[in-house]
Amino acid sequence: MNIEQLLDRYLQLSELKRPGYIESLGLPLPDSTQQLELAAGTPLAPLLVCIYNKVSGTPRQCKREGLIDFIPGFRLPHLREWPAAYEAFKLVHGEQWLPLLFDGDKGYYAINRETDEVAISFLDEFAFIDTISLNALNFLQTLVANYERKVYSVDRYGLLDYDERREGEVAREINPDVDYWMEE
């Protein structure tokens, strides 16, 4: 599967676990690519363009708590918020990194516009950035597998949850050359 097909599959799996999730992300804005380019310049990561050509993202004030997370603990920033997220991330890690997901505080998943690597970072006093996938395809394959292999679940409160041990197992299998997943 290509990036678009994997994203569609991930959204379908999210919808099965949390009905209403896709609708909560909103329709894409007609000028989404232009807005991203205006904020971050070019080239844009294809995954970022694919996402925002399908949806507009999770609004900061999402009405249903169970629909906030794209992955456990991280939401897809709404397109209107994305430029501010980019600026905050750029100050620490440079203009090559484009935010994908945000935890609402200092945590980000980001994609490198030059290498297509996906990384996690917390903009705290350490400001580390750790690669979690060598490319967007592996990143999406990992997310899809997390649903298909029951790593992701919905807890009794309707919130997206996950099994941390199983997440590492699945990620190591799909991303065998990434040190982040080799840590126990």
Which residues fall in each region the model found?
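Residues in well-ordered beta-strands of folded domains
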Residues: 101, 119-121
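Intrinsic-disorder-associated interaction segments
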Residues: 37, 44, 125, 129-133, ...
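Residue-level signal for alpha-helical context at structural boundaries
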Residues: 28, 66, 70, 118, ...
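Short acidic-glycine loop/turn motifs at beta-strand connectors
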Residues: 112-115
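Compact, glycine/acidic-enriched structural inserts
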Residues: 121-152
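Acidic, proline/glycine-rich low-complexity IDRs
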Residues: 148-184
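Extended hydrophobic/aromatic-rich secondary-structure runs
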Residues: 59-62, 77-81, 142, 151-154, ...
